[in-house]
UniProtKB/Swiss-Prot annotation:
It catalyses: N-succinyl-L-glutamate 5-semialdehyde + NAD(+) + H2O = N-succinyl-L-glutamate + NADH + 2 H(+). The keyword NAD applies. Its EC number is 1.2.1.71. Keywords: Arginine metabolism, NAD, Oxidoreductase. HAMAP family: Aldedh_AstD. InterPro entries: Ald_DH/histidinol_DH, Ald_DH_C, Ald_DH_CS_CYS, Ald_DH_CS_GLU, Ald_DH_N, Aldehyde_DH_dom, SuccinylGlu_semiald_DH_AstD. NCBIfam families: arg_catab_astD, PRK09457.1. Signal peptide: none annotated. GO terms for biological process: arginine catabolic process to glutamate; arginine catabolic process to succinate. This is N-succinylglutamate 5-semialdehyde dehydrogenase. Catalyzes the NAD-dependent reduction of succinylglutamate semialdehyde into succinylglutamate.
Amino acid sequence: MTELFIDGAWVAGSGPVFASRNPGTDAVAWQGDSASAADVDRAVASARRAFAGWSALDFEARCEIVKRFAALLTERKEAIATAIGRETGKPLWEARTEVASMAAKVGISIQAYQERTGEKRQDMADGVAVLRHRPHGVVAVFGPYNFPGHLPNGHIVPALIAGNTVVFKPSELAPGVARATVEVWQAAGLPPGVLNLVQGEKDTGIALANHRQIDGLFFTGSSDTGTLLHKQFGGRPEIVLALEMGGNNPLVIGEVEDVDAAVHHTIQSAFLSAGQRCTCARRIFVPQGAFGDRFLARFADVTSKITADVFDADPQPFMGAVISARAAAKLVDAQSRLVEQGAKPIIAMTQRDPRLGFVNAAIADVTGVANLPDEEHFGPLAQVVRYTTLDDAIERANDTAFGLSAGLLADDPKVWEHFRRTIRAGIVNWNRPTNGASSAAPFGGTGRSGNHRPSAYYAADYCAYPMASVESTQLTLPASLSPGLHF
């Protein structure tokens, strides 16, 4: 089984066999040998050898290869979307949007490099000041399972454009998507060694993260893993560490005129991708009183009608399975712990089959829970908090170590002005779902949500370092010498 891509060739791994499974059917989706520490070492060495030639290649030549990658993604959209759906459980309609986002990322990344990290010149009295940007070298990219194509792509594309070479370690839950994506890069004409793929589980990831020949590590995933990486690289300023992690995101509901619109945006915020987006709303702040009661009743009514089904079902469902049966069981357990602490289920979550990843969208009123845990439950479990004043809602919304996304649904622009000035998050939306984001804008947060803005416009910033030069085409003795110098 040749499932590793090293030095431009598909090769067999020498580590243990592992498999990914379709969470909606439990069928094996992919199987192969993992990369051992020796395989990882070969991949890093390959990337190191390729770095000099790739970084010396003309910027436009690098961009042409990346543009071919985007064109081929569009050609292979259905096949890649099917791979995404099979391994993640997300419906095909949503998987197709992920592939489209992967292709769109290329143009945005090229524009970002030119505007944020390109070359700038300024004349001086005795020469010219030049600002250039240089690639770091060999970077490790760790991808998540929820967007196994789009999110690693948000690191890989800007890294390659800047002239870095890459060793890619995808999630062990979505290796087939990684294989399909790297095949597109290969078809686009990427030179050997520029992008290497190491498949595997925890041991493969540890071997790559601990490798002394990487110059940077770009990670999208859980806050727990990201925090461990942050600790690991403490005291190593030579490593560029870019982290995009999770959030315990708040959505504050105001007394709006259009209740159905508010319910729609709340459902999109909480349950899109079966709640498996880092920007999904985890805490829904609803006003006390008659309006809040009416909103909650409608929210529960529409939520109760949401069905989850296999990724290729016809008609297509709003939600698919979560990533695994284990993840589904953890969500049900999280709900049970909240109930033990005083939460009141409005719609209780159940796991349809212990072998599968299907859970229903759930709502729990946690207003009465003292010391509500500051945790990200990565799935369709919405926690409702009733509030009395907007300032009360904002204070409680900010009571988190995370700071990824936040949203406000309100008709009054003055309420929005107050909210955006006082809420703490990297993505703050008004009358839009919390998981709505522009690829042309920074994507990321504060606190435990990360330290950079990966997977969007600002990714160019951590893919290259600035090099400042003062230059003159002629070497001449200055007309005026410093005191104490005699020629």
